[in-house]
């Protein structure tokens, strides 16, 4: 068996050497910036993105930049030793590739311990559907190679493209994990949202630290290629402790039940691998319990945990809302256009079936799914059945969206408590997982919803629905203005998500006006970026002008994040102008008393609006016209503020003041 594993390792190493020898197939001389000078992180990312786009590796720089900035917001990409590895995984990437910039002057980049100086930037462009391909193997090899101090130093000191490419082609490689007899064993899992850079570099640093400390360290990488280096049963059984270095859910986490675990961000091992291993060795293992002792760093605040749970539940419920709303809307349109009202109401007719299918997704499934996956976010798989039960109870007592949220939180926290306090011998693991957890959780969460908190929540939900239905005049204007402010305040951030959740909650209760407001406002920021850069290009930097060329298309699709690059560059003036115009748009749509029951339809919402007696054409004109009016106001304000800033030297552009 030992000989088999040695032979397997030798074959693996040979494959890795062949892969590393071809790293240059994923880059090009024109994708290398040597001794570059950038004034900001955004400028560096934009410059490298433009180089990849010029090589035909990226179809849409805007979509790619949006994804890169989204990844930047999730966690640090500066990895120490002067290295930053920003990356984006999106359909805008035609072919996996990377670009490199060595900097003449270090940039401040967000790292594990706060901002740090960076003089080497490697930008990875990752397509979403290339897992397991040679391209992805090359990218994973690259990120592993960046953990090699000698190779990284050669790249940083390269003065010509040939020297840099030669450093990438170096045959140096990583060493296999050494096996130390009578030494403790640490099992690890690394995983990051993109599944490339941090996943493999964190694994490499943990293995290096293990060799240095004389500890058996085995790392399972859950990356873009799926699970690599899967931990064996022997490794898990002999493990003293486990380190989870991840920012996404661990796959098959039940394998680690009973092993004391240390959970940290995926970038943590890159800077503090030895300290993490030493800390993990202090954790105590109990073979008689299945409860994992976790030392979570950093500990999530209740506010953060609640937000993540709600957004997780919503992310699973939205496809049901979109599908159900669209099917129901199509059935209604067919009945109206072709005069099929009788067929629409005739039980068991084909049109009635579609009506019931769409209505069932919205009225029956949506609430239990929302509750179940809100609970799942808090307590993993054991909370699913109790979450579904709590959602079903919410349906039974008519507490709607609000009941789903409350029920999901009850089920999630209840099952977390049960997991932490109900401890049985490991012989009863199956009984605990497949019987006690779902039965106790269902009885507990279901009973609390039906007989304790459900009725008060239903009263609040029904009161809120009645208030929303009764809004008119100044109240509707105020609601529209508030939603407009929230939608454009942070362009897809927490405030925007809070408005989105409110609108979905209202929609689930049969109130469609708030989402009509939200959908119209989403176009304002995108239209403003395009209009302002077209009308006065000299007031904007080159990357802002490039962004503006296609942002309007993202606006038609209902995507606000396309305006983020401009907002990051000049937040006060840009966000301020977006918000003012969006408040006007929201107020106009709110006053029109129109509704929208299909989220995510973008410009096609024009055909799905609930006109409430105003007429379909007038509702569509008013809804889209409100977005144009808001964009015009935002554009005028932004140009005025930007012109003043440029004139007084408070903002520097690539052009000359007109």
UniProtKB/Swiss-Prot annotation:
- Write out the annotated subcellular location: Cell inner membrane
Transmembrane stretches, start-end: 314-334, 359-379, 390-410, 434-454, 475-495, 501-521, 552-572, 574-594, 621-641
GO biological process terms on file: phosphoenolpyruvate-dependent mannosylglycerate phosphotransferase system; phosphoenolpyruvate-dependent sugar phosphotransferase system
Describe how expression is induced or repressed: Induced by mannosyl-D-glycerate. Repressed by MngR.
Q: NCBIfam families given for it?
A: FRU, fruA, PRK09765.1, PTS_IIC_fructo
Starting at the broadest rank, the lineage of the source organism is: Bacteria, Pseudomonadati, Pseudomonadota, Gammaproteobacteria, Enterobacterales
Q: What is known of its domains?
A: The PTS EIIA type-2 domain is phosphorylated by phospho-HPr on a histidyl residue. Then, it transfers the phosphoryl group to the PTS EIIB type-2 domain. The PTS EIIB type-2 domain is phosphorylated by phospho-EIIA on a cysteinyl residue. Then, it transfers the phosphoryl group to the sugar substrate concomitantly with the sugar uptake processed by the PTS EIIC type-2 domain.
Please list the residue ranges annotated as the PTS EIIB type-2 domain. Answer: 186-282
Topology relative to the lipid bilayer, per the entry, is: Multi-pass membrane protein
Query: What is this protein called in UniProt?
Result: PTS system 2-O-alpha-mannosyl-D-glycerate-specific EIIABC component
Q: What class of enzyme is it?
A: transferase
Recorded source organism is Escherichia coli (strain K12)
Q: Which InterPro entries match?
A: Bacterial_PTS_Sugar_Transport, PTrfase/Anion_transptr, PTS_EIIA_type-2_dom, PTS_EIIB-like_sf, PTS_EIIB_2, PTS_EIIB_2/3, PTS_EIIC, PTS_EIIC_2
Gene expressing this chain: mngA
């Amino acid at each position: 068996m030992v000989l088999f594993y040695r032979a397997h390792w030798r074959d693996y190493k040979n494959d890795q050497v062949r892969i590393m020898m071809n790293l240059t197939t994923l880059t090009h001389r024109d994708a290398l910036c040597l001794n570059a000078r950038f004034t900001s992180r955004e400028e560096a990312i934009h410059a490298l993105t433009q180089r990849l786009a010029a090589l035909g590796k990226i179809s849409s720089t805007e979509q790619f930049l949006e994804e890169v900035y989204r990844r930047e917001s999730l966690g640090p990409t500066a990895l120490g030793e002067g290295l930053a590895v920003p990356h984006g995984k999106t359909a805008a990437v035609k072919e996996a590739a990377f670009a490199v910039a060595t900097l003449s002057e270090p940039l401040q980049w967000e790292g594990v311990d706060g901002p740090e100086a960076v003089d080497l930037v490697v930008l990875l462009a990752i397509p979403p559907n290339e897992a397991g391909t040679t391209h992805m193997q090359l990218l994973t090899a690259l990120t592993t190679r960046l953990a090699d101090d000698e190779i990284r130093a050669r790249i940083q000191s390269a003065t010509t493209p040939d020297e840099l490419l030669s450093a990438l082609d170096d045959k140096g490689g990583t060493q296999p994990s050494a096996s130390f007899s009578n030494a403790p064993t640490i099992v690890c899992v690394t995983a990051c949202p993109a599944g490339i850079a941090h996943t493999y570099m964190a694994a490499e640093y943990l293995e290096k630290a293990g060799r240095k400390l004389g500890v058996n360290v085995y790392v399972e990488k859950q990356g873009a290629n799926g699970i690599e280096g899967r931990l064996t049963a022997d490794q898990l059984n002999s493990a003293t402790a486990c380190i989870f270095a991840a920012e996404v859910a661990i796959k098959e986490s039940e394998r680690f039940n009973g092993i004391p675990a240390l959970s940290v961000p995926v970038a943590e091992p890159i800077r503090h691998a030895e300290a993490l291993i030493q800390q993990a060795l202090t954790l105590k293992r109990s073979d008689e319990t299945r409860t994992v002792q976790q030392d979570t760093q950093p500990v999530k605040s209740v506010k953060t945990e609640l937000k993540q749970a709600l957004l997780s539940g919503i992310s699973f419920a939205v496809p049901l809302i979109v599908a159900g709303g669209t099917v129901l809307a199509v059935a209604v349109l067919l009945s109206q256009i072709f005069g099929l009202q009788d067929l629409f109401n005739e039980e068991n007719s084909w049109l009635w079936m579609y009506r019931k299918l769409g209505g069932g997704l919205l009225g029956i499934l949506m609430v239990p799914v929302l509750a179940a996956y809100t609970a799942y976010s808090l307590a993993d798989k054991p909370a699913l059945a109790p979450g579904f039960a709590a959602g079903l109870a919410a349906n039974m007592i008519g507490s709607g969206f609000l009941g789903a949220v409350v029920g999901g939180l009850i089920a999630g926290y209840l099952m977390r408590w049960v997991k932490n306090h109900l401890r049985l011998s490991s012989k009863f693991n199956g009984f605990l997982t497949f019987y006690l957890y779902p039965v106790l959780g269902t009885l507990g969460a279901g009973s609390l919803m039906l007989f304790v908190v459900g009725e008060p929540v239903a009263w609040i939900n029904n009161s809120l629905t009645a208030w929303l239905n009764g809004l008119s005049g100044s109240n509707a204007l105020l609601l529209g203005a508030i939603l407009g402010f929230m939608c454009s305040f942070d362009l897809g951030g927490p405030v925007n998500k809070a408005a989105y959740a409110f609108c979905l909650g209202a929609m689930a209760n049969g109130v469609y006006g708030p989402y009509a407001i939200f959908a119209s406002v989403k176009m304002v920021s995108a239209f403003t970026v395009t209009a302002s850069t077209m009308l006065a290009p000299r007031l904007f930097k080159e990357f802002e002008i490039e962004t503006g060329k296609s942002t309007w298309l993202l606006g038609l699709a209902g995507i606000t994040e396309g305006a983020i690059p401009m907002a990051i560059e000049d937040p006060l003036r840009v966000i301020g102008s977006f918000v003012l115009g969006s408040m006007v748009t929201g107020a106009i749509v709110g006053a029109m008393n129109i509704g929208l029951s299909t989220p995510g339809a973008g410009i096609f919402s024009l055909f799905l609006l609930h006109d409430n007696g105003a007429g379909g054409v007038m509702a569509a004109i008013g809804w889209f016209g409100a977005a144009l009016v808001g964009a015009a106001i935002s554009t005028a304000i932004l140009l005025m503020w930007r012109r003043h800033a440029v004139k007084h030297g408070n903002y520097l552009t690539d052009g000359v003041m007109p």
